[in-house]
């Protein structure tokens, strides 16, 4: 009997730092290892029939971590985009980001916008990365937008 795989898979990227700490390594080593696994998953997903992949990569709560860890995570995101952009585009992967970009480094924001534009018409795999994202934060931002629109009579 063959297994039916879902067309949309969501992964909460949690535990990489703890995994590394439990092995006596720096937390960022775990985050780098997690990014390597993501690369493998993104490559395999389309061949498995998965069309949508959502990665919850950095929540609004992650800002509470040490400055070193936050900066390290942002560097890993930037390096991933930089190293994988060509391969993703050639493989037909559309990459999008959700979450509040306003706190992110402007250079990272430009990189994100660039890869989104470059891969916009592709559809072999729809890769969505949630960065600076939180369900509660998303609701608050949506309500604020609605309130602003109502105040303007829209």
What are these regions, as identified by a protein language model?
Residues 1-154:
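Flexible, compositionally biased loop and terminal segments
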